[in-house]
C-alpha cells in the first residue's frame, strides 16, 4: 500500500539518521528510510543517490558508490516530489545539481540492469525466448518468471499467459531491448527459471515499474513484484 506524501515528510527530508549498515528492524537485513515518505524498506527495492564532489546528484542503482546514501522509494510521484520540493538539497545538507533528465537516467539504468541479468541467465542456461520455447518451459514447470515486451501483440500475450496463471510476469519497454540481450533484433516473450537471477530481475523490474508508471492492460494483477 502506497503512503500518501505529506508536507511533514518533505520538510523533514534528510539523509537517513542511521549509518548505511546500521538501520535494522528486528535483527533482519538493514532497512533504509525514504527522504520523502519517511517509510523504511529493504535497500534493494529503493533508489540510492550520492552527491559527487562537484555537488551533482548521482544515481547509484547498484548501491555501491562511496559516500553517504540518499534513499528514495522507487515511485514516480515520490521522485517528482523530491525534485520539486527541495528534499534532495535538505538530505544532502546543501545545494545539489539535479540532472534535468533524472527520470530518464534512472529508467534507462534499470532497463540496462535487467538486460544484463538476462545476459547472465542466458550464459547460465536459465532463460529462454520465443513463443514456443516459453510455452514449453511453462508446461514443463521450468519457468519461474515470464518476461514480456510491452510493444508485443496483446492477443499473443494473452494466448501465452493462458497457461501460466500462477507465474509472475515482468514487462520490459520494447522487444528491441529484450532482443539485444539475446543477440537478436527483437524478442517479445522470454522465460527465466527459478533462482537468484530471476529474483534480481524482478527487483529491478519492480523499481522500473514504480518509476515509469507504465501499466499493461490485462497484467495489472500479474506483477512480478516481490511483495
Task: Indicate where each model-derived feature is located.
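Helical mechanochemical/support elements of P-loop NTPase systems and associated helical scaffolds
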Residues: 30, 69, 84, 110, ...
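Conserved nucleotide-binding/hydrolysis micro-motifs of P-loop NTPases
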Residues: 41, 77-79, 151-154, 176-177, ...
Amino acid at each position: 500500500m502506497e503512503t500518501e506524501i505529506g508536507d511533514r515528510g518533505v520538510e523533514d527530508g534528510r539523509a537517513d539518521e542511521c549509518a548505511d549498515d546500521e538501520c535494522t528492524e528486528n535483527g533482519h537485513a538493514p532497512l533504509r528510510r525514504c527522504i520523502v515518505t519517511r517509510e523504511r524498506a529493504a535497500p534493494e527495492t529503493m533508489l540510492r543517490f550520492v552527491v559527487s564532489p562537484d555537488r551533482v546528484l548521482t544515481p547509484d542503482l547498484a548501491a555501491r558508490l562511496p559516500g553517504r546514501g540518499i534513499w528514495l522509494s522507487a515511485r514516480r510521484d515520490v521522485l517528482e516530489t523530491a525534485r520539486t520540493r527541495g528534499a534532495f538539497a535538505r538530505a544532502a545538507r546543501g545545494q545539489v545539481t539535479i540532472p534535468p533528465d533524472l527520470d530518464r537516467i534512472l529508467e534507462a539504468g534499470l532497463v540496462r540492469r535487467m538486460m544484463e541479468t538476462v545476459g547472465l541467465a542466458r550464459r547460465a542456461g536459465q532463460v529462454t525466448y520465443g513463443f514456443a520455447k516459453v510455452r514449453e518451459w511453462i508446461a514443463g514447470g521450468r519457468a519461474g518468471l515470464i518476461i514480456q515486451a510491452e510493444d508485443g501483440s496483446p492477443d499473443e500475450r494473452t494466448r501465452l499467459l493462458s497457461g501460466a496463471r500462477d507465474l509472475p510476469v515482468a514487462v520490459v519497454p520494447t522487444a528491441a531491448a529484450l532482443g539485444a540481450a539475446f543477440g537478436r533484433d527483437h524478442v517479445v516473450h522470454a522465460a527465466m527459471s527459478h533462482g537468484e537471477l530471476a529474483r534480481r530481475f524482478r527487483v529491478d523490474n519492480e523499481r522500473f515499474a514504480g518509476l515509469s508508471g507504465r501499466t499493461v492492460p490485462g497484467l495489472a494483477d500479474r506483477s512480478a513484484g516481490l511483495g
